From Swiss-Prot:
The keyword Repeat does not apply. The gene is Anln. Residues 1-113, 125-196, 212-402, 490-511, 623-656 are annotated as: Disordered. This is Anillin. Phosphorylated during mitosis. Ubiquitinated, and this requires FZR1/CDH1. Required for cytokinesis. Essential for the structural integrity of the cleavage furrow and for completion of cleavage furrow ingression. Plays a role in bleb assembly during metaphase and anaphase of mitosis. May play a significant role in podocyte cell migration. The modification N-acetylmethionine is found at M1. One of its GO terms (biological process) is hematopoietic progenitor cell differentiation.
């Protein structure tokens, strides 16, 4: 037995002993009136957490001195005041329970895991009402009576009070019993023989009923657990209510509300049924729903007994006769009254069970007895007889009408009940959902033997219940009972307003299902283990929504969907799965499908019932495509599958056993495995390259570069560029053809710009044609030569050349004359830079009018040519354009304007003059007037190379004699090598230490032109290097492995550097002084041959780049090449 169950049993035992001690200490009571006797009976008045009692009119009678007797009768006895009062106002009083003390922890269903016979012996005959059906097969009537008599012998002299009361209460008409089916006076052992005979007669009738109906133990057990003034709650609901009652804090409110509802309901039922058994009929509705077949069998037996012994029937309210009469009288009563009456009574039951099940007979013991009966029913449920015993009562339109009428009559007293009931439903939701979360995979152990019974139970309780609460009573399904009780202890009480509107009819309440959404809210909270603040916020939202549960003008489902739209996506998964199972089970019974399904605001937890009750792994089925069900549910819906819900597609197969397991992982390892699988990344094979073959890498790079340049593709690109330039030439020519006079732009800056564009396009087209011809003539042979060279030697890296601060000096005489002559011609200059066909740029136009700075024209633009090799050649070409002013005076213009008449001679003259004027342009191969040649003329050129770096003034070639240019061009040229050779690693360096050679392991970093080394890698960021080796000072033609004759260490490379000699230099093992230079021999040893080769490749690349791009910055190599 687990510690939790043992603790519950200990607390129950302590409570019982405390009650016995308290009752023994009470003095012998004299005959008292019913209300006073009722007030005096408070065995648990000193228990912890007791709330203030209600007014005396609403207190419960409790005159029996023994807790054992209370337990024996606490579910079926009729309260003394009930039997005396016949008016409905008085009838209501006994049903209002005293504020039950909040017990620290009610007994959990786990405590009921014992066999059926064992608890009967444990609890003695006082619990025989719960276990009598099982024990009746092995005990006789005489044995039981003896046991009861012996049990009551240790009760003290207080019994006289009870005897007088019981003998006085027994003959009262049973019409008053309708108010509250409380305890019948069956077991008072006192000095008065009448009282004893009456009790024994009652007990005999009860036991006879058990023996006659022993085969239907499960149904009887379920109904024996009824509470006074309440309908017989199904086992799961009772357990759920008992477990959820831990955090209840509204006993008085609920107890107060319970009274008027039951009284009114029973009074209204009397005209339509036997007055003596109205309440008993209503109390049996849920039992008949759960197991109508066995109870009906018991009905015929007990009815025969009633005909034979009517006096005994009035005197004794045997629980089994009560149970048996209910289904028997159901046909006589229109079935609408039953569910409504049961709804009212179940509301009261929920309130009482939530608050420690405060019943008149035994307030502290009821939860344990109920759970014992529930466990017994669990065992009996597994048998086929139990499954076969489920029947569904038929519901007619008259039933619905009576239900609505009764509900309207009771709305005044049900307002507070609704609020309290909704609160209990919230707590049960949380308990069940967290029970699911805690239970995890443990459900799969009971899958084979209990899944079918669970399906039937859920189907009948959700699909076939007539009352609002019955739909909710399946929340605590049997596998969840113990977990529910455990979780309920830590569950925060959800406080709801007690002034909730409750004026809508049954059919109106079926249109809204806010609690379904509330279920998803609570489920999300339990699954995510939200913080208390988040729980309070969600509860506030629930409270706001629940205030309009029964408002007929608001579609609560739509409102809550808006509020909890994000919660629905997660919560609907399990509900949808369960809903499909409900549809399948419901389709098997055509009779049940014809019945109407009444859903009120009290029964909106049906989705929860489906989720929890059908959560076994067999229900994992593929959901159909997503669809939105209708928000409003018709009252005559034949299936429970019409609740409003958003179907969420779930990609799971029917045989996927792990679907629920994936949702509710039960261990950290399982969660981690699931998480890693879900976030599985593509497998990346990480390789730490310490033996990289740089030679092959460089070879591949060069081969790829040469191979990727397809000849045909290159030729196609050149042709496209040629066509593009041809288009530019044509457009520029058309623009220039329009410049015929000053009015049309002749001599303007626009004309000069058009000439510039024409010049650039023409020159570029010529370069592209030249490149195309080279490709056609040489083909791939020329590129193969370069690739062979690059493979045999280390190819230098590409670089970039930057030209800036370009200026073009002019002759001083020309500058002076231009300044004096304002009507002189305009001189435009243009510098064009050519570095092959693909890289050609031109400067903007510079004129003597606006770009003259001193005696030179300045070009502020900076040009950078990228990806040029070390043997680059940049051709600088200077072009000039002279725009002369119009020499015609104003008189000639006037005369020309006068002769406007066109004569044949003038027309011929104009044609011939135009032809002579544009004769130079007509020679274009594009046709007459198609294209033009630029009027820019070349006035100087120069070729720049790497050797030009460092100079700023270059002489121009081909300068005309009368040109205004001085003959030089000034610019600044700079080069940058795009070499990104870097390497890091450990090398062992040979050093001279006091004349002795020593190898020291260093962390070496090759960056730029230097090798810097430290002792440790971390020192690179914190300390200055121990030493540096400048590769620009290397005089070796190529870095090679050290000669083994001089250096025996393997994997060693030799690097010889020189530097100017210093005064303190002297010869060591690694350095020698020659003339004015100090030559140092550096031996660097790698760990492996591959690493040595890698370092050699990197160092050689750096040396090549230095020597080719910075020839003046390094020493020339010495020795053989």
């Amino acid at each position: 037995m687990d510690p939790f169950t043992e603790k519950l049993l200990e607390r129950t035992r302590a409570r019982r002993e405390n009650l016995q001690r308290k009752m023994a200490e009470r003095p012998t009571a004299v005959a008292r009136s019913a209300p006073h006797a009722k007030r005096g009976r408070e065995p648990l008045s000193e228990a912890s957490n007791q709330q203030q009692p209600l007014p005396g009119g609403e207190e419960k009678s409790c005159t029996k001195p023994s807790p054992s007797k209370k337990r024996c009768s606490d579910k079926i006895e009729v309260g003394a005041p009930d039997l005396e009062n016949t008016e409905p106002i008085d009838v209501a009083k006994p049903c209002s329970p005293m504020p039950a003390p909040r017990q620290a922890k009610p007994p959990a269903p786990a405590a009921i895991s014992e066999s059926v016979a064992a608890p009967a012996a444990l609890l003695s005959a006082d619990r025989g009402l719960n276990s009598g059906s099982e024990a009746s097969a092995t005990s006789s009537v005489k044995t039981r009576m003896q046991r009861l008599a012996e049990q009551r012998r240790h009760w003290d002299s207080d019994l006289t009070d009870d005897v007088s009361e019981s003998s006085y209460f027994a003959p009262v008409p049973t019409e008053d019993k309708a108010a509250s089916p409380s305890k019948p006076p069956i077991s008072n052992a006192s000095a008065t023989p009448v009282g004893r005979r009456g009790r024994l007669a009652n007990l005999a009738a009860t036991i006879c009923s058990w023996e006659d109906d022993v085969s239907h133990s499960s149904a009887k057990q379920n109904s024996v657990q009824e509470q006074p003034g309440t309908a017989c709650l199904s086992k799961s609901s009772s357990a759920s209510g008992a477990s959820a009652s831990i955090n209840s804090s509204s006993v008085q409110q609920e107890a107060t509300c319970c009274s008027p509802r039951d009284g009114n309901a029973s009074v209204r039922k009397d005209p339509s049924s036997n007055a003596a058994h109205g309440p008993l009929l209503s109390a049996s509705v849920s039992s008949s729903v759960k197991a109508s077949s066995p109870v009906t069998a018991a009905t015929f037996i007990t009815e025969n007994r009633e005909a034979q012994n009517p006096e005994l029937l009035h005197k004794t309210a045997s629980p089994l006769k009560t149970e048996a009469r209910k289904p028997c009288e159901k046909p006589t009563l229109s079935q609408g009254a039953q569910p409504k009456e049961e709804a009212n009574r179940e509301v009261c039951l929920q309130s009482q069970s939530k608050d420690k099940l405060a019943t008149p007979g035994g307030r502290g013991i009821k939860p344990f007895l109920e759970r014992f009966g529930e466990r017994c029913q669990e065992h009996s449920k597994e048998s086929p007889s139990y499954r076969a015993s489920h029947k569904t009562p038929n519901i007619t339109p008259n039933t619905k009408a009576i239900q609505e009428r009764l509900f309207k009559q009771n709305t005044c007293s049900s307002t507070t009940h609704l609020a309290q009931q909704l609160k209990q439903e919230r707590e049960k939701e949380l308990a069940c959902l967290r029970g699911r979360l805690d239970k995890g995979n443990l459900w799969s152990a009971e899958k084979n033997e209990k899944s079918r019974s669970k399906h039937l139970e859920t189907k009948q309780e959700v699909h076939c219940q007539n009352t609002p609460l019955k739909k909710h009573q399946t929340v605590a399904s049997t596998p969840l009972t113990s977990v529910t009780d455990k979780v309920a202890e830590n569950e925060p009480a959800v406080k709801l307003s007690s002034t909730e509107p409750a004026g809508s009819t049954e059919s109106e309440m079926t249109k809204s299902s806010p609690l379904k959404i509330t279920l998803f809210l609570e489920e999300e909270k339990s699954l995510k283990v939200a913080s208390d603040l988040e729980v309070e916020q969600n509860t506030e939202a629930v409270r706001e929504v629940e205030m309009s549960v029964d408002d007929e003008d608001i579609n609560s489902s739509r409102v809550i969907n808006d509020i909890f739209s994000d919660v629905l996506e997660e919560g609907e998964l399990d509900v949808e799965k369960s809903q499909e199972e409900m549809d399948q089970v419901g389709a098997e019974n055509s009779e049940e499908q014809e019945d109407a399904l009444n859903i009120s605001s009290m029964s909106l937890l049906a989705p929860l019932a489906q989720t929890v009750g059908v959560v076994s792994l067999e229900n994992v089925i593929s959901s159909p495509p997503s669809e939105l069900r209708d928000s409003n549910l018709s009252a005559a819906s034949p299936k429970p599958g019409k609740f409003q819900r958003t179907r969420v597609p779930r990609a799971e197969s029917a045989d996927s056993l792990g679907s629920e397991d994936r949702d509710l992982l039960y261990s950290i390892d399982a969660y981690r495995s699931q998480r890693f699988k879900e976030t599985e990344r593509p497998s990346i094979k990480q390789v730490i390259v310490r033996k990289e073959d740089v030679t092959s890498k460089l070879g591949e790079k060069k081969n790829v570069f040469s191979g990727q340049v397809n000849i045909k593709q290159k030729m196609q690109e050149l042709n496209n560029d040629i066509n593009l330039q041809q288009t530019v030439i044509y457009q520029a020519s058309q623009a220039l053809n329009c410049c015929v006079d000053e009015e049309h732009g002749k001599g303007s800056l626009e004309e000069a710009e058009a000439e510039r564009l024409l010049l650039i396009a023409t020159e570029k087209r010529a370069l592209l044609i030249d490149e195309l011809n080279k490709l056609k003539s040489e083909g791939p042979q020329r590129r193969n030569k370069t690739s062979v060279i690059s493979q045999s030697e280390f190819a230098p890296s590409k670089g970039s050349v930057t030209l800036s601060e370009i200026c073009l000096p002019l002759k001083a005489d020309f500058v002076c004359s231009t300044a004096q002559k304002t009507d002189a011609s305009n001189y435009y200059y243009l510098i064009m830079l050519k570095a092959g066909a693909e890289q050609m740029v031109a400067t903007p136009l510079a004129s003597t009018a606006n770009s003259l700075s001193g005696d030179a024209l300045t070009f502020p633009t900076t040009f950078t040519l990228h990806d040029v090799s070390n043997d680059f050649e940049i051709n600088i070409e200077v072009y000039s354009l002279v725009q002369k002013k119009d020499s015609l005076g104003p008189d000639k213009k006037k005369k020309a304007s006068k002769s406007k008449a066109i004569t044949p001679k003038r027309l011929l003259t104009s044609i011939t003059s135009k032809s002579s004027l544009h004769s130079s342009v007509m020679a274009s191969p594009g046709g007459l007037g198609a294209v033009r040649t630029s009027n820019f003329t070349l006035v100087g050129s120069h070729t720049l190379s790497l050797s030009s770096v460092g100079d700023t003034k270059f002489a121009l070639d081909k300068v005309p004699f009368l040109s205004p240019l001085e003959g030089h061009i000034c610019l600044k040229i700079s080069c940058q090598v795009n070499s990104a050779v870097e390497e890091k690693g450990f090398l062992t360096i040979f050093e001279d230490v006091s004349g002795f050679g020593a190898w020291h392991r260093r962390w070496c970093v090759l960056s730029g032109n230097c090798i810097s080394y430290w002792t440790y890698p971390d020192d690179e960021r914190r300390k200055n290097p121990i030493g540096r080796i400048n590769l620009a000072n290397c005089i070796s033609h190529q870095i090679e492995p050290a000669n083994r004759e001089f250096c025996a260490r393997r994997n060693t490379l030799e690097l010889i550097t020189v530097r100017p000699q210093r005064e303190d230099d002297r010869e060591t093992l690694v350095s020698q002084c020659r003339d004015t230079l100090c030559v140092t021999k550096n031996w660097l040893s790698a760990d492996t041959k591959e690493e040595r080769d890698l370092w050699m490749q990197k160092l050689n690349q750096v040396i090549v780049d230095i020597r080719l791009w910075q020839p003046d910055a390094c020493y020339k190599p010495v020795g053989k090449p």
